[in-house]
Structure formats: C-alpha cells, structure tokens
C-alpha cells in the first residue's frame, strides 16, 4: 500500500513547508524545537549527505549573514564549488540555499519534499530542520567542495550543529531571542559557543571581557 502523495507544483510544496512544519514566525517560541535528535535521524535516513563536503559553521547575533555571504564569495572566487545556507529569506524560500550564488531550483525543492514526505511527517520536523536537511542534501547532489552553514538560532541545539566543520566562526553576540536562548549575554554566548567542537579551530568577533572566566 503506502501513501500516494503528489505535489503538483512549487507553491504547493512551499504551502506544505510553511503550514505542516511549524514556523517560528507564525507560532513563536513553541515552534522552537531545540535538540538534534530529529535532524540526526532524518540526515541518517538521507545517508548523512553533510559528511561529503567541507563545512564552515557561522553563529552570532550581529553580522553572521554578512560574514557567511563574504566567506562564500571568497571561496567561490578562489575556485571552490561553494554552498551557502542562510536564513531567513526575503522574497523566495530558495534564497536560503545557494550553490555558487545560484538558488536551488524549484524542482529540487519539490522533489525532495515529495520523496521524503513520510519520514518528515513521522519525525515531526520543524520548518528549519527540514530546510537544513534540504540544504545538506542539495549541496551533496551539487558536488560542492565546501559549504558555509549559518546557524538558525543560537548554536548548541541548532539543527545545523550536526556538522563537523573545518572551522567555526562566532560573530558578535547581542541580546536576541532572549526567551529561547537566555536573558543575559553570557547565557546567549554559551548557546552560540555550543558550535565549538573539540579540535576544530574557532574564529570569534569582538572580544568582550564579560565572557572571560
């Protein structure tokens, strides 16, 4: 038997993503599903595509988007086939997932959701987890050599923290998403610092004496 499910077009696919998968914009804090269990299980189902290329992980409050875009641009200019995953998007969901500056094709988004619909529903993936897995998978299919991956929220429990990067970057920390990440700079810094991994170099933005100790 099994399911018969056919997505007709890109717009319907987006409708599914934004409605069936809880989005932070719509639901607020309850949409924030910290933890790596679901994304780990789903990426395993995909064959762990995120392990097939080098990654650079970027977290922080201020400037992480700009830093991510600059890094991708520099890598591309240096001749590397480069993936870039950022959020949120301005006009089109596909702005989040770029290879050498080009957005993921609409058909790739449709095919991915159609193919993995059952598993995503079963695992109860959040909108961001789904987007992250799509990026990981598309970068692998596109034979990228290196991908710049920006965290969605925080770092420690962020879906992107599944990757083992060649370097982690933490830009300046500020008070944002305090209800989710903590209400003081050190607490937020601790969440962002969650992307730091043993034996992986880290580059940090402006040093702040308050975080020493």
Regions of interest found by a model, annotated:
Residues 1-2:
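Residue-identity detector for glycine
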Residues 5-60, 67, 73, 77-78:
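Short functional linear segments
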Residues 57-59, 83, 203:
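Short, conserved beta-strand segments within well-ordered enzyme catalytic domains
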Residues 71-72, 171:
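Walker A/P-loop phosphate-binding motif and the immediately C-terminal alpha-helix
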Residues 155-157, 164-213:
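Conserved catalytic-core segment of NTP-binding enzymes
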């Amino acid at each position: 038997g099994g399911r018969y499910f056919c997505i007709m077009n890109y717009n319907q696919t987006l409708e599914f993503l934004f409605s069936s998968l809880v989005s932070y914009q719509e639901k607020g804090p309850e949409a924030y599903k910290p933890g790596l269990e679901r994304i780990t299980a789903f990426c395993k189902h995909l064959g762990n595509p995120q392990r097939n290329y080098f990654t650079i992980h970027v977290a922080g409050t201020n400037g992480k988007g700009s830093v991510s875009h600059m890094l991708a641009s520099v890598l591309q200019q240096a001749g590397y086939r480069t993936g870039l995953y950022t959020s949120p998007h301005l006009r089109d969901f596909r702005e989040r997932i770029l290879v050498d500056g080009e957005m993921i094709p609409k058909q790739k988004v449709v095919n991915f959701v159609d193919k993995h619909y059952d598993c995503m529903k079963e695992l109860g993936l959040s909108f961001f987890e789904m987007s992250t897995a799509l990026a990981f998978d598309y970068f692998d299919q596109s034979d990228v050599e290196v991908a710049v991956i920006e965290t969605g929220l925080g770092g420690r429990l962020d879906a992107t923290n599944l990757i083992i990067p060649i370097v982690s970057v933490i830009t300046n920390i500020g008070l944002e998403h305090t209800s989710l990440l903590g209400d003081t700079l050190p607490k937020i810094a601790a969440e962002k610092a969650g992307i730091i991994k043993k034996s992986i170099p880290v580059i940090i933005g402006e040093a702040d004496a308050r975080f020493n100790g």
